[in-house]
Structure formats: structure tokens, C-alpha cells
């Protein structure tokens, strides 16, 4: 099943997925929204800016500049932009996408202006286009180096989810399917906020007891919000939520965790963002999750605490004291 795939978004994650598709035998073209980045990839046949461990692209992967003019060449479009650029990318696609083409999203987060799920944005703008989400515990560098990785493909259309599953899967990359596109998105987005929380705790040297508590109680918060939005309960103990949460909260390959770590060590937000020197999705997602939780009357103490640190200049030590002295209650 050889296909022609366009990848929009040439960060580490988009590039790693483009490599996976090329290793799988597909013809892949990748585009960066920065012209100079496209020129570098075309000239050097690599993406050393984001994936320096990959010396050269395989023969089936090449950069492309004017993708709109060449849209007819592709069977599927993979969107791997930051969440801030997702809506504009879908709007661009609306102007040129063909009826037989479909979309796969590898973006995690919520719409920055409306706090809507990204699938809702895609369905609103392109109501007749098939849409799937690829998500789960996966660092780009490890996937690019063909280390064993397992993820989830979520779509309302199970047959389309299975198509995407076949598109990507090989001996190094295993895709599972689900129709719970809401739960898969909520887990993948909110875990970025909690990774910041875990990083702050690590930076303040709170220890592994606190780390375990953050992951466990954080999972409970994700589940509460997800169920309110219409997700299935079982999704939250799967790869798209628990798996991704464990990975992102526990390893400094995560930009969100590193950002939190720097904050916990005393840096300001701007200093920490500069030190990470890449998109920190959880910083923006914290605002969306905070507003969604307030809108739906969902109690999320860890998310609210992180929001206060990020947007209200709250002192992390004061926040910890407040969290630990909240009214005692039953775990469930």
C-alpha cells in the first residue's frame, strides 16, 4: 500500500513521522511554514535544526515549498504544526483540498481562541473530509531512530482509523485504533500541562513520592474533564492518556517538563521559554484547560495550580502548601 503523503509542519515530531512514513515505503513531502527552513531542508536533504541525529533523509522523503500548487499529487495530508497554527493550516487546506483526500493530525492541544478540540475545528471547516488523530507516548528522536514505539490512531470512522494504522505500522512502530477521538485528544493535550507541573516539582526537589502523586492525581483530573466532554472512561488508562502522561512527566526529552524544571529552579517564565528554545505546548494549553474546566464546572486542582503559577505569578511553594492542606476527602 504505497501512498503519497504531504506533511505540513517540519518540527521534530512532524519530521519523525515523515521519516516513519518513508521507512514504511511511502513517498513523502514535508513543508515548513518558514521559507528559509524549507530551503535548508532542500539544500542539505536533512532537518538538522530539529533532528540533528538524522544525517540524511531517505530517498522517499523530500522537502517541498509550494505544496498548494502540488496538492493533487497527495493521497493524505498529515498536519503536525503547533496547536497555535492548526486552525490556519486547516483553513489553507480548505482552499485546495480535493474530495478524495483525507487528513491525519499529529498536533496536541486545543484551539487557542475558542478552546475547542482540534477535531471540532477540522470538522467545522472541512465537514466532509475524513479526519484521524495520531497520538500517544512518543518522543520524536526515538521514533526517528526507529526505536520501538506504540501509539493510537483515533477517528470517528473506524475504517479510516484502520487505514491510517496500516499506513504507519511496521516492526518498530505499532498503531492501535480507537473511535474515542475526544478522550484521545484530552489526554494528549492536558498531559502537557501536568508535565510542567511535574517539572516544577522536580526543579524544587520534591522527590519521587510527589512525582508519583502528581501523575496519579493528574490522571484523575484528565479523566474528569474528558468524561464531561464526552470521552470514554477506558481511554484514560491507554496509550493516549496514561502512557503519554507517564512519558512526558518523567523524562527531560519533554519540552514541557524541562520548562517546568527551569521554573522550579527559579527561572522566570520568559527565561525558561528562552532556555527551552522551542514550542512549549503546555504553557498555552494550561489557559485552555483552565477555561474549559471552569466552563464545565470540573475541579482540577493541579491544573488550576499550574495555571496560577504560569499566569498569575503565584509562588510554587505557596501553591504546594495550599494543595497539601486542601479539605481531606475520599480518593474517588
Swiss-Prot record:
The keyword Lipid metabolism applies. Sn-glycerol 3-phosphate binds at residues 108, 136, 138, 191, 244, 254-256. Belongs to the NAD-dependent glycerol-3-phosphate dehydrogenase family. GO terms for cellular component: cytosol. The gene is gpsA. Coiled coil: none annotated. PROSITE patterns: NAD_G3PDH (PS00957). The active site is at 191 (proton acceptor). Its main location: cytoplasm. It is found in: Cytoplasm. It catalyses: sn-glycerol 3-phosphate + NAD(+) = dihydroxyacetone phosphate + NADH + H(+); sn-glycerol 3-phosphate + NADP(+) = dihydroxyacetone phosphate + NADPH + H(+). NCBIfam families: PRK00094.1-2, PRK00094.1-4. GO terms for biological process: carbohydrate metabolic process; glycerol-3-phosphate biosynthetic process; glycerol-3-phosphate catabolic process; glycerophospholipid biosynthetic process. This is Glycerol-3-phosphate dehydrogenase [NAD(P)+]. The keyword Aminoacyl-tRNA synthetase does not apply. It comes from the Bacteria. Catalyzes the reduction of the glycolytic intermediate dihydroxyacetone phosphate (DHAP) to sn-glycerol 3-phosphate (G3P), the key precursor for phospholipid synthesis. Pathway: Membrane lipid metabolism; glycerophospholipid metabolism. GO terms for molecular function: glycerol-3-phosphate dehydrogenase [NAD(P)+] activity; NAD binding.
